[in-house]
Amino acid sequence: MAFCNKLGGLLRQNISSNGNVPVTSMLGSLRLMSTKLFIGGLSWGTDDASLRDAFAHFGDVVDAKVIVDRETGRSRGFGFVNFNDEGAATAAISEMDGKELNGRHIRVNPANDRPSAPRAYGGGGGYSGGGGGYGGGGGGYGGGGGGYGGGGDGGGGF
């Protein structure tokens, strides 16, 4: 769905600006969207270089990035690999999804665009204050952490 929204936005933007559709810029945007992969389930020891090495034999890896926590510098257990062409990305998905990398079975999927609008639930509020609410990160009925879908083990609650 994100792909269709992006494509529609590109078409509207390019057609409305001058009436012509610059095919090369549209294809370039589509190529970038279809070559970026989400890699989940990474071990804490996987870094950018080892992620790149694991996917390099499928084709030219433009970028490989393990996402780390800003405060601790520790891996968050997922990352992204961007290939130069779609064929390499497709081969990497079919061959690497579910395979073991550094002792963990990884998930490999096409990367989705980051949502531009904030999520409908979560953050700020909830019955006991402190953020959260039904899907968020703190607060909730019992105070502490949690809420219906939140994180933490705030204790209390029901």
Swiss-Prot record:
Descriptive protein name: Glycine-rich RNA-binding protein 2, mitochondrial
UniProt-annotated location(s): Mitochondrion; Secreted
Record's comment describing the protein's domains: The glycine-rich (GR) domain is necessary and sufficient for cell-to-cell movement and to interefere with zucchini yellow mosaic virus (ZYMV) infection.
Function: Promotes the cis-splicing and editing of several mitochondrial RNAs (including NAD5 transcripts). Plays a role in RNA transcription or processing during stress. Binds RNAs and DNAs sequence with a preference to single-stranded nucleic acids. Displays strong affinity to poly(U) sequence. Exerts cold and freezing tolerance, probably by exhibiting an RNA chaperone activity during the cold and freezing adaptation process. Mediates cell-to-cell trafficking of RNA interference (RNAi) signals (small RNAs (sRNA), e.g.
Domain RRM: 35-113
Stretch forming the signal peptide: none
Superkingdom to which the source organism belongs: Eukaryota
Pfam families per the UniProt record, alphabetical: RRM_1 (PF00076)
GO biological process, one term: response to cold
UniProt record similarity statement: Belongs to the GR-RBP family.
Gene this protein is translated from: RBG2
